Curated annotation (Swiss-Prot):
The keyword Nucleus does not apply. The lineage of its organism: Bacteria, Pseudomonadati, Pseudomonadota, Gammaproteobacteria, Vibrionales. Its cofactor is Mn(2+). InterPro entries: Calcineurin-like_PHP_ApaH, LpxH-like, Metallo-depent_PP-like, UDP-diacylglucosamine_Hdrlase. One of its GO terms (cellular component) is extrinsic component of plasma membrane. This is UDP-2,3-diacylglucosamine hydrolase. Mn(2+) 1 binds at D8, H10, D41, H197. Pfam families: Metallophos.
């Protein structure tokens, strides 16, 4: 019995090697799991559920096959795929999670999230996030022709790359006090998230001497990064792209 967690694959037609590894993972590993959690940034950028491309259908097909074979799949939106919506969920069978979700892992209560909201020192990003998550703005964006949305997204991606070059690694990492605050909010001793691309298992001792665990998922840029969680053990492993 085990549950799988992945995040930050940044799937794109530009990186067929990552796509191939993802498909292999879905068909050979995810199919054997009790459940699969995708904690954001599955896509390098998801323009909208109306994406007509062969690439988008290819990815949706993998999820559809997995869920139709009885493996529950849960999806947390990241900062690159926050436009994943109900249509995507209906077409794939995945269950969309809120930004912060409490789950039961073999008797262990845990909070799962993408992780971007933990980076409270990155105020410019959080301001941007607040704007693009406004429902009216997302509805307006959804009404635009797909080709125009592609152009706007390319501009946004360029701005994001430029902005990251001027930020320190500390600003783009989580704020420890925010991590503790979220864990206290949900009364949990385990947190699992992605976003920072710094895979690790951290032990945290709080002021009341409670020992908590924060598991950070890795990205898939150079190799597949997967967390296998069972009742006895949490194991990170990486696999080279085929």
């Amino acid at each position: 019995m085990h549950t799988l967690f992945i995040s930050d694959l940044h799937l794109s037609p530009k990186h067929p090697d990552i796509t191939a590894s993802f498909i292999q993972f879905m068909r050979e590993e995810a199919i054997k799991a009790d459940a699969l959690y995708v904690l954001g940034d599955l896509f390098d950028f998801w323009i909208g559920d109306d994406d007509p491309t062969t690439f988008a259908e290819q990815i949706k097909s993998e999820f559809r096959q997995l869920t139709q074979q009885g493996v529950p799949c849960y999806f947390t939106k990241g900062n690159r795929d926050f436009l994943v919506g109900k249509r995507f969920a209906q077409q794939t069978g995945v269950q969309l999670l809120p930004d912060e979700a409490v789950i039961d892992l073999y008797g262990q209560k845990a909070v799962v999230l993408h992780g971007d909201t933990l980076c409270t020192q990155d105020t410019r990003y959080l301001e941007f996030r607040a704007k693009v998550h406004q429902p009216w703005l997302q509805r307006l964006f959804g009404l635009l022709p797909f080709a125009l949305k592609q152009k706007l997204v390319r501009k946004i991606q360029s701005d994001i790359r430029d902005d990251k070059q001027h930020k320190s690694m500390m600003i783009m990492d989580v704020t420890p006090s925010e991590v503790i605050a979220v864990m206290h909010r949900y009364n949990v001793d385990l947190m699992i998230h992605g976003h920072t691309h710094r895979p690790a298992i951290h032990s945290i001792q709080t002021d009341d001497q409670t020992l908590k665990t924060r598991i950070v998922l890795g990205d898939w840029y150079s190799q597949s990064s997967i967390l296998v969680y069972s009742k006895q053990l949490a194991t990170h492993y990486c696999r080279d792209h085929s």
